[in-house]
A protein has these predicted regions:
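Extracytoplasmic small-molecule ligand-binding "clamshell" domains
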Residues: 1-6, 13-15
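Generic hydrophobic-segment detector
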Residues: 5-8, 112
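Alpha-helix C-terminal capping segments
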Residues: 8-10, 103-104
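Small-molecule-sensing regulatory modules
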Residues: 17-33, 37-43, 54-239
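Short glycine-rich loop/turn motifs
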Residues: 46-47
Length: 239
């Protein structure tokens, strides 16, 4: 939560933090790279306005004069002020959703990825305040230093490569010339599969990067169409 402040004041040259906490701290930093992932998916998370499922509140305007609890106090205050809705915003030290469940506050502003916990606690989302994701950020002086900037760019490349590899695997296989076209038609790829001629001119080696979740169906189909010696291997980076 405080990383953007350390980046801004030069304590750190480079760091990872969320868009939400950059906005909360109003930090003056350089955004080097958006990194779209969250705890359970490769999607952005959302900051949402949440009320009890049985509450009468249906929209953000219904919060006029109400009490809201959140960890994102400064952003929330500004958000409601910009909409000219008067609310009392208090800081939450944790267990934010429990406060609205127990009736300690009228609503909470909380971060969510899937919304499943909110539903499980018999709560309801009535408004989305913003989407957030991790960003690689740099101190402005560090970014303007050629040596440091080169190192920062290298780190960015490795992080992006790791993200692009998530959920993907590599596939290798051998295919005879007569089955090549049928097998190739089944293989998805980032661009096009790599095809190499084996020592026997009637056989080819195919290599491709595919979504891991699809291999359970893909591999049996490849075998049916004549692929042999199929190897599936994990990926660390795709650059």
């Amino acid at each position: 939560q405080e990383i953007s402040r350390y980046i801004e004041d030069g304590t750190l040259d480079l760091g990872l933090t969320g868009i939400d906490w950059i906005m909360e701290n109003e930090s003056d930093i350089v955004v080097v790279q958006d990194l779209i992932y969250s705890k359970v998916s490769l999607r952005q998370a959302r900051w949402v306005l949440v009320v009890r499922d049985d509450s009468p509140y249906q929209k953000i305007e219904d919060m006029e004069g109400k009490k809201i609890s959140t960890e994102l106090v400064n952003f929330t205050k500004k958000y409601f002020a910009d909409k000219k809705i008067n609310v009392q915003v208090e800081f939450s030290w944790g267990a934010t959703e429990a406060k609205v469940v127990e009736g300690l506050v009228d609503a909470v502003v909380e971060v969510t990825e899937t919304g499943s916990t909110i539903k499980a606690n018999k709560l309801r989302i009535i408004h989305e305040l913003m989407k957030t994701n991790t960003q690689l950020i740099a101190n402005r002086a560090a970014w303007n230093d050629p040596w440091k900037r080169k190192k920062i760019e290298q780190i960015k490349t490795m992080l992006v490569g790791s993200l692009q590899a998530m959920g993907k695997v590599g596939l290798k296989m051998n295919v005879s010339k007569k089955n090549l076209e049928k097998v190739m038609s089944l293989i998805p790829s980032l661009k096009a599969p790599t095809v190499s001629t084996l020592s026997s001119t009637d056989w080819f080696a195919i290599e491709s990067i595919v979504d891991a979740k699809g291999t359970r169906e893909l591999i049996p189909r490849l075998l049916e169409e004549g692929a042999q010696g199929i190897i599936e291997y994990p990926l660390n980076k795709v650059v």
